[in-house]
């Protein structure tokens, strides 16, 4: 039986004035897929991810989440937005983002950060949200002592693990990771990648923008190489890394794998 389609992005474009950043990018993620998006800085990777959950408004394209077509209309600037605010709210509970710079609320404790969205967006009681938050904080290795601290008192690796717990607490269909290790000191990268690998092994559906070629090669089920806003090459990791066809991808990997 074919796996259930969790996310389908069709022919996504993004323009800023006359400059086209995304030139028709498509992606299909089935349940349990781990899709890594690689490419040079400025290739459109993060913009693509942000357009998927409408932190950026795409210019053209269609997005289907769990078989449900997202109803899009044009805003006054000609960009696409979700027609129904309730559908946008639902979309963001189904596709949760882990950001490069953590984006934790500085005035809330670690535990409060993870409880907030389940209470405000999902309507959970404080008791249920607390139980859920404790479960996912334990999953990412944040102990009780750290749970009462404010983000400023945590290492970057701990903050990013809290950010992952916060995304997991929404129990989404797809986890979106936007370069989750690029703001970390090198010695802290491994602890975050280990959590992500564990999530992949548990069958979580993930779309990951990353510069971590080891993760992309060994954990992904599918790899997309973006170049100048287009998919230059894609395939399974062994194909993309072991036998790249595009000269641009060959050059990129030569530089990345030194």
Curated annotation (Swiss-Prot):
Domain of life: Bacteria
A cellular component annotation (GO) from this entry: plasma membrane
UniProt: ATP binding residues: 41-42, 44-47
Reaction catalyzed: a polar amino acid(out) + ATP + H2O = a polar amino acid(in) + ADP + phosphate + H(+); L-histidine(out) + ATP + H2O = L-histidine(in) + ADP + phosphate + H(+); L-lysine(out) + ATP + H2O = L-lysine(in) + ADP + phosphate + H(+); L-arginine(out) + ATP + H2O = L-arginine(in) + ADP + phosphate + H(+)
Pfam families: ABC_tran
Any GO MF annotation of the entry: ATP hydrolysis activity
Family: Belongs to the ABC transporter superfamily.
Activity regulation, short description: Isolated, soluble HisP has a very low ATPase activity. ATPase activity is slightly increased in the presence of HisM and HisQ, and strongly increased when HisJ is also present.
Residues that span the membrane, as ranges: none
Gene3D superfamilies tied to this protein: P-loop containing nucleotide triphosphate hydrolases
Membrane topology classification: Peripheral membrane protein
Gene: hisP
Domain ABC transporter intervals: 7-253
Function noted in UniProt: Part of the ABC transporter complex HisPMQJ involved in histidine transport. Is also part of the ABC transporter complex HisPMQ-ArgT involved in lysine/arginine/ornithine transport. Shows ATPase activity. Responsible for energy coupling to the transport system.
EC numbers: 7.4.2.1
Keywords in alphabetical order: Amino-acid transport, ATP-binding, Cell inner membrane, Cell membrane, Membrane, Nucleotide-binding, Translocase, Transport
PANTHER family according to UniProt: AMINO ACID IMPORT ATP-BINDING PROTEIN (PTHR43166), HISTIDINE TRANSPORT ATP-BINDING PROTEIN HISP (PTHR43166:SF15)
Cell location: Cell inner membrane
Subunit structure: The HisPMQJ complex is composed of two ATP-binding proteins (HisP), two transmembrane proteins (HisM and HisQ) and a solute-binding protein (HisJ). The HisPMQ-ArgT complex is composed of two ATP-binding proteins (HisP), two transmembrane proteins (HisM and HisQ) and a solute-binding protein (ArgT).
The name this protein goes by in its record: Histidine/lysine/arginine/ornithine transport ATP-binding protein HisP
Enzyme type, top EC level: translocase
């Amino acid at each position: 039986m074919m796996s259930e389609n969790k996310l389908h992005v069709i022919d996504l474009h993004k323009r800023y004035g006359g400059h086209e950043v995304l030139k028709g990018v498509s992606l299909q993620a089935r349940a349990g897929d781990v899709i890594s998006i690689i490419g040079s800085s400025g290739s459109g990777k993060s913009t693509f991810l942000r357009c998927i959950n409408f932190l950026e408004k795409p210019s053209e394209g269609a997005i289907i989440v769990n078989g449900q077509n997202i109803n899009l209309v044009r805003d006054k600037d000609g960009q696409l937005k979700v027609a129904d605010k309730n559908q946008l709210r639902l979309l963001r509970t189904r596709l949760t983002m882990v950001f490069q710079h953590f984006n934790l609320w500085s005035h809330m404790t670690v535990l409060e950060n993870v409880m907030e969205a389940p209470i405000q967006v999902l309507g959970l009681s404080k008791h249920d949200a607390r139980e859920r938050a404790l479960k996912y904080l334990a999953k990412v290795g944040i102990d009780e002592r750290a749970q009462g601290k404010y983000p400023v008192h945590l290492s970057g690796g701990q903050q990013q693990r809290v950010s992952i717990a916060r995304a997991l607490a929404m129990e989404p269909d797809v986890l979106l990771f936007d370069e989750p290790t690029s703001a970390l000191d090198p010695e802290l990268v491994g602890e975050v990648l280990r959590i992500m690998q564990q999530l992949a092994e548990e069958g979580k559906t993930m779309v990951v923008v990353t510069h971590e070629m080891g993760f992309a090669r060994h954990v992904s089920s599918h790899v997309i190489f973006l170049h100048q806003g287009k998919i230059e090459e894609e395939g399974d990791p062994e194909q993309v890394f072991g036998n790249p066809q595009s000269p641009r991808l060959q050059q990129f990997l030569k530089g990345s794998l030194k």
